[in-house]
Amino acid sequence: MYRAASYNPFNESVFLRTWTEDGQRIDTEMPFRPYLYLEKDGAEDAVSIFKTSLMKKTFKNSLERKKFVDNTANKRIFHNLGPEQQFLIDMYKDQNNDPKFSQFPLKVFLLDIEVDTTAEPGFPVPERAAVPINLITIYDTLTKSTHTWGLKEQYTPTLPDCIYHRCKNEQELILQFVDFWKSDYPDIASGWNSSGFDFPYIINRFMRIFGEDFVKQLSPVGNVRGRKVFTDMGKEVTVWNISGVSLIDYMDLYKAFSPGEKESFSLNYISEIELGEGKVAYNAVSLGELAQTDWKLFVDYNIQDVHLLVKLEDKLKFLEIARMIAYKGCTNFEAALGKVAVVTGAVAIQAHKQGMVIPTFPNNLDREAFEGGFVRDPERGIQKAIVSFDVNSLYPNTIITLNISPETKLGKVIQGDFENLANDPKGEITIRLLNDKIHTLSGEKFKEFLIKEKVALTKAGVLYSQKSKGILPNLIDQIYKERVEAKDRMSALKKELSQIEKVIKSKENRA
């Protein structure tokens, strides 16, 4: 039950944002030292998925651990996770599947900014943040209130629980906004294309006006940092992180969680198809001209953009989905849009439940290329008696059925027609086990081996033990069952809703 975790390597602690048992929002600092496991004969700290003995090694901070890992060549390292995730797993690995774990609501700021596009030709560049911010709107999901800060004349809100803050200049707007932000820090801040525009523009503009130290106030632990990444189009951009507050782009959420191709990912198009309403229409040439000629409509435009996000989240619950995904792997919420951290965390937790620790290989380890998934070649020609099967969740159920998991893998067939054992029982099969020992068996002996030792044979010729359920099959089975239960509940609720609608319609007809 957490809202965020921020690790500080300099004071060896984690700043944890959580709740009390009765739902009060609290922040607390807890001592924490990162660690990892190493293989050592006779060690008793833990057991790896390979059944080897492990020794726990603790470090003063993450910098010391990284230096150790960088200097450790060609050695298997275990449970070398990020400090925040390691801390969260230690704290919550036995609770994260409990429905009560997510019982308290998060404080989400849905936001949108406008800038003075008349001050400079062309579209404003977030990295430069050269023109003033003239409008910011935030919707607070916890208080159900809207706050707008603007530079021009007074504005009378038409929406309930909407407060307009008139500011004399941009400096006052920024100061008031930051005071509001830090009066009760959000758990998540989100907007449409906010990682591409709003967040970088806010941070760079604030730094330009007040300096780097001022921007640190956006974080409850005073830590705001950026890192350079390349977009799919090859453009270098800065992705910002505010420790203690998850920055999540709602457009990225929509792309990740909404099925099917879309003609456009503009907020106007998506809100039209999802909600049946779009952005505020205007006749001005640009938003810059609109701000100069009709300030009220300009503010309406900005507020409507935020309230479209509110309505999208009310309908789609994508931020709630991101929260549930993050809890599965004990990560901070922004990691839900990735794959590695959540999956690694979920597997590490499942391994712990089965009394094992997973490997996390150092970056400098030489890695061999992975062979792609098995695809059977089609047989050309006219076929008779064709049957088409639609298998429910084929890949997950294949993993469960064959017990495919790193620790259950025994070896692989390297020679022989193992698919034709029934027709050629005397043919020879050669297998290589994980210890690199090679055995050649007759087809008949190979079949006996599979049955006696409870071994599953995949179409790619890989051998998996069936003696005990693997980590991945266990995890997938659990998630699959939860999915089935959720779909059953949805089906029951739809039937219940249909009955309610019939009753209402019947009463309306009688009236």
State each model region's role.
Residues M1-E84, R208-N241, G276, V280-A281, ...:
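Non-catalytic nucleic-acid-binding interfaces of large nucleic-acid enzymes and RNP effectors
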Residues R3-E44, Q95-I188:
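Conserved RNase H-like, two-metal-ion catalytic cores of nucleic-acid enzymes
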Residues I89-Q95, K100-A119, L218-W240, A348-N364:
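Extended, Lys/Arg-enriched charged tracts that mediate electrostatic binding to polyanionic substrates
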Residues T118-P121, H147, F199-P200, A256-S258, ...:
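Short helix/loop capping segments that flank catalytic or ligand/cofactor-binding pockets
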Residues T146-L151, T156-Y164, K168, Y185, ...:
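Active-site-proximal helix-loop-helix substrate-binding element of RNase H-like nuclease domains
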Residues P186-S194, I325:
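Short glycine-rich phosphate-binding loop at a beta-alpha junction
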Residues V285-N403, K412-E419, I504-A511:
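Common nucleic-acid-contacting/processivity interface regions adjacent to the catalytic cores
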Residues V391-A511:
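Helical catalytic core of nucleic-acid polymerases
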